From Swiss-Prot:
Formation of the three residue Trp-Tyr-Met cross-link is important for the catalase, but not the peroxidase activity of the enzyme. There is a cross-link at Y272-M298 (Tryptophyl-tyrosyl-methioninium (Tyr-Met) (with W-125)). Keywords: Heme, Hydrogen peroxide, Iron, Metal-binding, Oxidoreductase, Peroxidase, Signal. GO terms for cellular component: cytosol. There is a cross-link at W125-Y272 (Tryptophyl-tyrosyl-methioninium (Trp-Tyr) (with M-298)). Bifunctional enzyme with both catalase and broad-spectrum peroxidase activity. It comes from Xylella fastidiosa (strain 9a5c). This is Catalase-peroxidase. Residues 237-256, 317-336 are annotated as: Disordered. Pfam families: peroxidase. GO terms for biological process: cellular response to hydrogen peroxide; hydrogen peroxide catabolic process.
Amino acid sequence: MLYIYYLFKSLFFHTLFVFSIYKDCPYMRASSPETTSAVKCPFNKTAVEGTHNKDWWPNQLRVDLLHQHSNKSNPLGETFDYAKEFQKLDYAALKRDLHALMTDSQDWWPADFGHYGGLFIRMAWHSAGTYRIGDGRGGAGRGQQRFAPLNSWPDNVSLDKARRLLWPIKKKYGQQISWADLIVLSGNVALESMGFKTFGFAGGRVDTWEPDQDVYWGRETTWLGGDVRYGAVSEGVHHPDEHRGAKEKAAKNSDSRVLENPLAAVQMGLIYVNPEGPDGRPDPLASARDIRETFARMAMNDEETVALIAGGHTFGKTHGAAPADNVGPEPEAGELEQQGLGWHNRFGSGKAGDTITSGLEVTWTKTPTQWSNDFFEHLFGYEWELTKSPAGAYQWVAKNAAATIPHAHDPSKKLLPMMLTSDLALRFDPIYEKISRHFHAHPDQFADVFARAWFKLMHRDMGPRVRYLGPEVPVEELIWQDPVPKVSHVLVDAQDLLALKQKISASGLGISQLVSTAWASASTFRGSDKRGGANGGRLCLAPQSQWEVNQPQQLSVVLETLRRVQTEFNAQAGDKRISLADLIVLAGGVGVEQAAKRAGIVVEVPFVPGRTDALQEQTDVSSFAPLEPFADGFRNYVKGDEVVPSEHLLIDRAQLLTLTAPEMTVLIGGLRVLGANVGGVKHGVFTDRLGTLSNDFFINLLDMGTEWAPVSKERHVFEGRDRRTGVLKWTGTRVDLVFGSNALLRALAEFYAAVDAQEKFVRDFVAAWSKVMHLDRFDLV
């Protein structure tokens, strides 16, 4: 696989959404016109037009990112169960309706070649294609293409029409099919209706009802800009002060083509690469370098990349009938009467043969509504010379070729074969050429690789197979799905758990060892693409067992001890067994219970057995490398130099763990006093009762008898000294002190520091701990 570790050497990509806090981010400033109807509204002086906190303090900590997608924006209510609704769906009837739609050309948006297949393939591709392996964000899983910024990206021109074509079907089937699932399924049906056998389809994508705010799309301030993501000050992560002059430095180094992590697209508003070539320069070899980088960050290898480009470009066409100055504003900037549609085209009829989308005017094959090997026939069958589309975009025309390509809307016309710069990359890059010639000679293998790569593209952000719904889920298990074995043993019961807890307590392992190991196992979970977590026990396997944050030496001691407990238990007669994955989580719960008891509170940490242990051969090391945290504020850990304030990295980590602000707060307070810091550092350990689950962290942080000061100009670590005597009392990091500094987090800290809060603190910690331990247990939902 090409997404090799060097692409992620800094592992900054887990954290980059935090750039939305910086004032030069385009999404920090509204793009609405200066004068709106609100000014003339009789209800003047509303909050909408007022100055907001972010206007005064653009670098505020984005605690609000932990409270996205609440039921206040969701009309379905808390009891709605999409999986149950999906099971009621007449799936066969839905597919028949989608098949019929493919050739039901509408006058308001006529189908190219009488078939909407190419349009729906593009819509599905552009929905799923925003996924990036770096932080797991993007992808088709939430139907985000309906909302800004994606609904208004330059690369998504005309997809507003595709979704409107789908609306009658969505209306018919209601909540039994989500927009997210319907968009992907329409792409599958489009392929099938044009003679291609797909690998399968899985439903289960649950719609959201507002834009994701946590996704970092880049810092360019113009559409199709790429001036910052290449040659940036560092690999995509900066302190706010470093943004001064970032664009100038980027411009000087743009030839380096070092793409900022975790971004995959080469320009703001594109899904992948610029089809004209890097920065519009028609150089196929340079385009190949961009393609390899961006598809690798999409978790695709070279073979999958060639298959996806060639397979996708077997169908349909691009649109560039006239220059872009004929096109109106995007949907988010449209007038009310446009009803959410954008890019109104003033050229000719504005549709059919007059359509302007990318500005390119290319039909790749003689049969654009039928699966074929024509793409490779043309790629290698002609020599190519540079030309321009009617819109002025660079593209390539076949030399000395006959006009054999059909016109999309005039059957009497034939056109010359055309290709994009990004297509020719598959011929002129030596590695891509070898793969392309192989596919040319072996069309059956091409079809199989494309089918599998398309399925991977559509499902990469869905997580494990247990989340898949529907009658077309493939039987075959794939390595990128992070498979875990099925439970093949009798699960432990309450009596067994009691005996195991006693064994763990008597094992000699301390509270900090038990707690930190369980946290290391479970906290890899990413709510973005549903990867990671404790199930599979991959903490015991490469690469996780060697991550610095997991303290490999201590980890090996803990795992060896727990294996002895496991071996002794599993040696008993009968089929009852416990996996190491389960035992790690159970042991963490034992540590929490012991610590709570020391605080005078008896609790039982919830535990549900059923995890299994994955094998090393079920674990793609390079695919798991991006899950290694660059920073984990819960363990007071930052790898290398702290180039982004660590409190912002904490928000990123908490958001990936799907935590609320109170859950994040209580976990920080508890993990500090339980000694979970990496390396046993004392920063933030504001207690003299280490191993006791007390609220001491909050009490001592908020003590006005302590005066804090940074220990260096970098301001990463602080000393807390007695305000009267100057005696050193504590040390803390930015993550620790932010709970006294940030107004929202201080309010929560004050709640847990109150005299009557000790028991509440313990029970809230147990609840938040249990949530993290079970985040990947989709089998329980």
